[in-house]
Amino acid sequence: SKPDDKLLILEDTNSDGKADKQINFADDLHIPIGFEIAHDGVYVSQSGSLVFLQDTDGDDKYDQREVLLSGFDDHDTHHAISSFCADPSGAIIMSEGIFLHSHVETAFGPQRGSNGGFFRYDPRTRRLLRHAQFTIPNPWGVAVDAYGQELFLHTSGTSMSWMLPGMVKARYGANLKAPDLLKTNKVRPTSGIEFVSSRHFPDEVQGDILINNNIGYLGAKQHKVIDQDPGFTTEYRQDLFVSKDLNFRPTDLEFAPDGSLYVVDWQNALIGHMQHNARDPNRDHKHGRIYRVTYPSRPLVQPAKIHG
């Protein structure tokens, strides 16, 4: 059968906090586990390639597909480039998990990755760099603070680390260390990470880090990030939300232009590719949820007018 994975636009047309309109931006994709929005389209992972889907006529559906780069390893698909995150310069950080060996030919020369780490793609120059090299299982979560410092999740374990030490160009095969910044109240596995940067949320929590957990704890932990030479440490602040629904699987979270927080719930009874048969009928391929978190005692932010 033909690929039919989708990128959907969910729109709240009457500003009541609930989506009431759905548009299929793309409906012919194959496992798009990482994407980042551009002003005229979307950068998305497609098998072993980074692809740009461009909307040329403004109808919220892509018209042109351009393969920007190929050669990313995808033989173990859930480790392939994913969890895209734009840094302050507009470059896209792309995560890659263990067991993969990527060799990407670019106009600036080949870029290689082995056994986990991060690539950085600059859309303006079309330059790809091996951004950081770590042996990490599933880095399903990258967040960038107000100063451009990047933190990332290890996912299979409980750890969260600072990315900068892995940017050192080490000798081939060297296993650079990624010290864990979380001291207490950490649960595995993790998926989805975000810095609090919203005038809708209280002043005292700005700069905190939010971390989703989806098996050992069904919710999100909130930690204060503290500067500590030569990097950072953290201090547990609170559980931001938790669910009694055993199928609640928060996998991503991001702040919206109005200051509210959106949380993606995979909503699945089964999780993991080793524990259950891939064709187990209890795997839910059709349902998911998106929650919107607000802070009632503070007003929402008036979004900036981008177009029109």
Which residue stretches match the model-derived regions?
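Beta-propeller domains with acidic blade repeats across secreted/periplasmic ectodomains
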Residues: S1-G308
